[in-house]
Amino acid sequence: MNNKYTIIKQESIEELNGTGYILKHDKTGARVVVISNEDDNKVFQIGFRTPPKDDTGVPHILEHSVLCGSREFPMKDPFVELVKGSLNTFLNAMTYPDKTMYPVASCNDKDFQNL
């Protein structure tokens, strides 16, 4: 870990042959879950609570809008570009009734850092 996080909980996870950590980012309060083991496939996911106020589908529209780029990052469809040149083992975005998630995975360290 590093000095920007406080370890809230640590425990062995036998099913994954590893150790699980729940961390809290000291500055933002963001919760981070880390599972450390010997698996070559590295996975990262960022997720947000997105409870809808109605049934118009705004969280799902926002999921796609986030991936449309911006002035600072002018890339129309980053997933398409990543798939072209990435060794990813998983790359997606998902909206559930109460949350939106963006998971990525790769067995290649350099590629994983680029995702």
Where do the PLM segments sit?
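M16/MPP (pitrilysin/insulinase) zinc-metallopeptidase core fold and M16-derived inactive scaffolds
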Residues: G18, S36-N114
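N- or domain-start disorder-to-order transition segments that initiate the globular core
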Residues: M1-N41
